[in-house]
Amino acid sequence: MAKKTKIILICAAALILAAAIVTTLCLVLVKPSEETPTDKTTISLNVNAYALTEDETFTIAATTNSTDVIKWTSSSPEVASVSSQGRVIAKTAGETTITATVGNVSDSCRVQVVADNAQATIKLAQTTLRLSAASGAMQIQGTVADGDSQQTLTEAGATYETDNASVATVSADGTVTPMSVGSTLVFVSANGRTKTVAVEVYTMLVSTAEDWNAMLGLPGDLAARFYVTNDIDFTDVVYNAKVNNGGDVLLSQSFCGSLDGGGHTISNVTFDGSVSSQSLFGTMVGCTLTNIAFSNIHFTASGAAGLAIRVLQHYNVADKNGNATRELLFAPCYVTNVFGDFVYDYNGVSGITGIYYGGGMENVFVNMRMSDGSALNKTTDFAVAKQSMVWSMADPNWFPNNYLNNVVVLAESGAVNAAWDTTYDGAGLTIGLSGLHCVTTKMEAGYLVRTLFDNNMWTVTPGQLPELR
């Protein structure tokens, strides 16, 4: 009996010890980490109402207990805009609300702008400067008029101030020097008036076919910014196609960042027949493509896709040696106000991408045609993509970023498939196709573009393909 008692006591002690360990572990698990917020985020502005005259500026001070960046917005930026540092710039008579937001809390200030009858005015030669490291610095030009007299900015003793010196600096004579990729404002003041110049600093300003090829040859960078300054004709120029379009998704091998076409057209590209998996950008991830037209883009291999072989919303984290790990990060693509005129030698093609992993497309027009005038085949040719692979197991927060809004695909000869040939992992369930319109005549295409697209960006001439303005 003594032995049994001993065993029972030992077991009881073990249970007590185990309970203590579990209790200790539970305490450790619920202990707040350094990242767990202990105080409620607050923000307050030093004024709740303010009045300005046209061309005046005023800086609102915000106080917050958060270390996050404060986001400033104006409800009516045409009346008064606000910089990233809270500086309000009055533009025209009216009323607006300036809001400062940090996290999920905000505070606001009502701003009234009244008309200024003073005769002094500042006229700027350019209200936006687009710069890159290669383009170098640029001087702000303009005049100051006061009654019947008119002076240059220098003659009027204009002063200059940058809103963010880490993006661009400005000297006493108004010379703006790019420092890093990003956006900022420069304030130009003279005779009691202030005007603003928007400064956009890019990774590269793309002006020629050679520039375009150089852009495609750069390692992918989510922070990259590109701007097209001219129409670019690839006649007699070999296109630098990206060919790493399968397997793991590495930023270094993908097209990333933002590309603003400035309403310009890339034309007359003919792919070398030796290039397989032909597309304009190869693999796109974390890419914003906007305001650009592609005309007479000739694909010479089967399986071609207009914009990209893969449009993705995730990529593999690379290790120190540049090799892919199994960790995935979220980086969706957004395609807006894009025109594509794509010519194919073979069937088995896609209008936009070979495989669509998600992302957003809006106000996109694609004209698909065969080079020999033969018909497109609804069984083998697809309006958007042959495959859809939007993962049902992905983070639910990813789903709202998947949409097709106002995508118009024209196939005058034959027809193209408006759905996916293959879906994986519940794909297609998170993407509605009601925003995709497949048509067979220019009249139908023109009607849809005129009624659905932004008329400030697009123009429609009866009997012709829609055009970006």
Show the residue positions of the predicted features:
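N-terminal Sec-pathway targeting helices
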Residues: 2-16
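Intrinsically disordered and other compositionally biased segments
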Residues: 12-14, 28, 42, 57, ...
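Predominantly extracellular beta-rich ligand-binding scaffolds that present long acidic/polar faces
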Residues: 203-469
